[in-house]
């Protein structure tokens, strides 16, 4: 295994190495966005913009649940990988058990502190009038499924951590497939509308979590679901949370950004929220593919920063070129068939026109957004956790003043363009931070090989 890793780090063609490290991550991130696409796609057949808005308004809550999953999934997953590299299989059982039951406990806490306040939370998210009840109903199902949603994110990360990316993809594919089957049955067959969409996603997450649990119980001797092993110590907590907290923070700030944006859009009516919801789901496809690409090559870039800076530069060039190709293809698609893409989700012409405009603007930020992902990953890989944390905070902080200024100057059009402006500023900030820290970047290459 070590020789194979060294081959991809040092000798394989750059593109082959890039795909080896990135493809599983790209597929995983791509599948994760399909959940939201499915819900809006099927709800769109009901031709009710209030329902589309209700689903769109819940995006920040989903980001928070994902963040709670990443707290243990990313944090413990990377720790488990290091333990396996050190042949410390026994300790990995304790880490996995604690993280699994810690995630379940977090999910139960989410139910207790949110379910009684679903209406109030829906209002905070920006729901008004008829949309308020629909959003609240969707949130209730989401909150009740929180333990399984969090568990799903944790176990999916564990599958990757132990070197079973195919198991991760099978679990996600099965979940998406089940959602495709359940959504039309629950939404139309049982006439549950928004609640049906929420139930379809919830049941799919439950099924996926159970799939992973059964797999680990039968096939893994390094991931344990035995609650008796859920005994944390100071070292374990430190190793999990020093990586998990930044991952959690990034997801939380993503949700906060979505919340602030929803509040601005709410001033311009239901159609503005629905339009953004559709365009956001569409732009997520290439955005998450690029995110997976950038996160996947982090070990490759980090290793060659120390071992072969020429190869590192070639990798960075290859990633930037790949981002550029994705950007050109997506922009071409948006400007040629963007109207038809949006039309798959609604027949309301006002929403179609607005969503198409938003899609063009947000897709235009894809190139700089991708470069921002790449440079943030470089900061993480080369030991600059503080720089990466600063970037995560900036992503949430920059958008707020930009929104206020652009909204005051140009109204709804300004709110939409603020997305492109904020992404551009974040990308420039990432490049500046990397430049300023260029002489301080260090990495432990032995950890990369072992992990």
UniProtKB/Swiss-Prot annotation:
Key word Ligase present: no
UniProt GO cellular component terms: plasma membrane
Keywords carried by this UniProt record: Antibiotic resistance, Cell membrane, Membrane, Transmembrane, Transmembrane helix, Transport
One Pfam family recorded for the sequence: MatE
A single MF term (Gene Ontology): xenobiotic transmembrane transporter activity
Description of what induces expression: Repressed by MepR.
Recorded superkingdom: Bacteria
Membrane topology summary: Multi-pass membrane protein
Subcellular location: Cell membrane
Transmembrane region(s): 26-46, 54-74, 97-117, 139-159, 170-190, 194-214, 245-265, 282-302, 318-338, 355-375, 397-417, 418-438
Disulfide-bonded cysteines: none
UniProt-listed GO biological process terms: response to antibiotic
Signal peptide: none
NCBIfam families noted in UniProt: matE, MATE_multi_MepA
Function per UniProt: Multidrug resistance efflux protein involved in transporting several clinically relevant monovalent and divalent biocides and the fluoroquinolone antimicrobial agents norfloxacin and ciprofloxacin. Required for transcription of agr and RNAIII and involved in the production of protein A (spa) and toxins alpha, beta and delta.
Family: Belongs to the multi antimicrobial extrusion (MATE) (TC 2.A.66.1) family. MepA subfamily.
Protein name: Multidrug export protein MepA
Organism, as annotated: Staphylococcus aureus (strain NCTC 8325 / PS 47)
Upper classification of the organism: Bacteria, Bacillati, Bacillota, Bacilli, Bacillales
């Amino acid at each position: 295994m070590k020789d194979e890793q060294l081959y991809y780090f040092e000798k394989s063609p750059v593109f082959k190495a890039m795909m080896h490290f990135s493809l599983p991550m790209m597929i995983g991130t791509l599948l994760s966005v399909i959940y939201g696409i499915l819900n809006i796609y099927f709800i769109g057949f009901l031709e009710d913009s209030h329902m589309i808005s209700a689903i769109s308004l819940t995006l920040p809550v989903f980001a928070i649940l994902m963040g709670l999953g990443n707290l243990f999934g990313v944090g413990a997953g990377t720790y488990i990988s290091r333990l396996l590299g050190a042949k410390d299989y026994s300790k990995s059982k304790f880490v996995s058990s604690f993280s699994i039951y810690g995630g379940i406990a977090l999910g139960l806490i989410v139910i207790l502190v949110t379910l009684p306040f679903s209406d109030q939370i829906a209002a905070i998210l920006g729901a008004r009038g008829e949309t308020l009840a629909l959003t609240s109903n969707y949130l209730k199902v989401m909150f009740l499924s929180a333990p399984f949603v969090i568990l799903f994110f944790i176990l999916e990360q564990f599958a990757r951590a132990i070197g079973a990316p195919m198991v991760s993809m099978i679990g996600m594919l099965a979940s998406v497939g089940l959602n495709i089957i359940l959504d039309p049955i629950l939404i139309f067959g049982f006439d549950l509308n928004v609640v049906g969409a929420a139930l379809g996603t919830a049941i799919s997450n439950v099924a996926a979590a159970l799939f992973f649990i059964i797999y680990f119980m039968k096939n893994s001797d390094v991931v344990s679901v035995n609650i008796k092993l859920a005994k944390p110590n100071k070292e374990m907590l430190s190793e999990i949370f020093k990586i998990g907290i930044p991952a959690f923070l990034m997801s939380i700030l993503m949700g906060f950004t979505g919340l602030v944006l929803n509040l601005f859009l709410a001033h311009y009516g239901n159609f503005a929220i629905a339009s953004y919801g559709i365009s956001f789901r569409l732009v997520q496809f290439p955005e998450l593919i690029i995110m997976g690409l950038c996160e996947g090559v982090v070990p490759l870039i980090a290793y060659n920063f120390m071992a072969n800076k020429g190869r590192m530069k070639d990798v960075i060039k290859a990633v930037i070129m790949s981002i550029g190709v994705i950007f050109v293809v997506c922009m071409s698609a948006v400007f040629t068939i963007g109207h038809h893409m949006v039309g798959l989700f609604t027949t309301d012409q006002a929403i179609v026109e607005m969503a198409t405009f938003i899609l063009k603007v947000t897709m235009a930020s894809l190139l700089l957004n991708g470069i921002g992902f790449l440079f943030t990953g470089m900061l993480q890989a080369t030991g600059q956790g503080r720089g990466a944390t600063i970037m995560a905070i900036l992503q949430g902080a920059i958008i707020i003043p930009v929104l206020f200024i652009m909204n005051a100057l140009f109204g709804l059009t300004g709110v939409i363009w603020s997305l492109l402006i904020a992404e551009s500023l974040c990308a420039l900030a990432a490049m500046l931070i990397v430049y300023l820290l260029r002489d301080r970047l260090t990495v432990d290459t032995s950890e990369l090989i072992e992990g």
